[in-house]
Amino acid sequence: MKIQLVTPAPLKLNNGNKITAVRWAGIFKKLGQRVRVTQNYDGKPCDVLIALHARRSADSIRRFHELHPALPLIVVLTGTDIYRDIRHDLNAQRSLEIASRLVVLQKMALREIPKPLRRKTRVIYQSAEPIRASRSRANGIFDVCVVGHLRGEKDPLRAAMAVRDLPSQSRIQVTHIGLALDPRLEKTAKQEIRRNPRYRWIGHLSHGKTRQRLARSDLVCITSKMEGSSNVLSEALASRVPVVASRISGLMGTLGNRFPGYFPVGDTERLKALLLKAESQPKFYRDLTRYCARLSDRVKPKREIEAWRRLLAQFA
């Protein structure tokens, strides 16, 4: 089977969509398929089109369907699709209607899909290979890692704000990895570095180096306002690094309702209290670590591979 995988993200940009597309291309090859990854549908022959992003890939989805109405078309919904665009954007809504199958990346996203379309929707959790790295407390630092480009949906400076005025005995330090995609947020981040000795923004790292840095941290902090799912969350769970996360559907669909590390979106004081609790209360930190470790099975690559195998087999 020849698969064309369309992702609207520039292939040189190291973001979630790019990471997802590269991982899926590897999965399809393991399943014995031939795959090409492009930003747009280019009209070249393929047996199935898989498009990431209902709105941003809408032109590719429409063109493929017009040219090949009998061929399978799989549309993968992102966070902005699920929690914004499919409610109001006609192009996104049309993408859902004409797709042979829809894919969402965590179970709570199903609630947002129009009821008549849920029967053709599949949940496929994002996976990650485990990376083991030693965490050294020799320097006394409690290392909190934030991974996310500087753009509004990520609320990327929330962790920095939460550690501004911690008690002097706290050893929390926040390390932030990500590109500046918003000039205003870039300016704010640079100001934050000058005023906040607990915050470091180190900019872009390769995906491999980012994963190593994440695996060495004591805690991963995910502050997003909107997510379809999160590669960073899957990578933290795979490496058994405990997480604190904003209470949003896109994260709750993987973490579950009983996860003890939630804070309300944008609530700096609640996040501050949660970070201090993780640092200063060993029992809470152990409970958080154990909860996240139990979820590591959910993000194992073999589960994602099998889910895609079952889906593609429907069109073989």
What are these regions (language model features)?
Residues 16, 280-313:
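A charged, aromatic-enriched C-terminal amphipathic alpha-helix characteristic of glycosyltransferases
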Residues 19, 151-165, 184-187, 269:
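A conserved mid-protein helix/loop that constitutes part of the nucleotide-sugar donor-binding site
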Residues 97-131:
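A short, active-site helix/loop in glycosyltransferases that binds the activated sugar's phosphate group
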Residues 135-164, 174-177:
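Conserved donor-binding/catalytic core segment of Leloir-type glycosyltransferases
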Residues 173-187, 201-204:
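Glycosyltransferase donor-sugar binding loop
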Residues 225:
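Aromatic "clamp/platform" in nucleotide-sugar-dependent glycosyltransferases that forms part
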Residues 242-245:
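Short hydrophobic beta-strand element within catalytic cores of glycosyltransferases
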Residues 257-269, 277-283:
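Conserved acidic donor-binding segment of nucleotide-sugar-dependent glycosyltransferases
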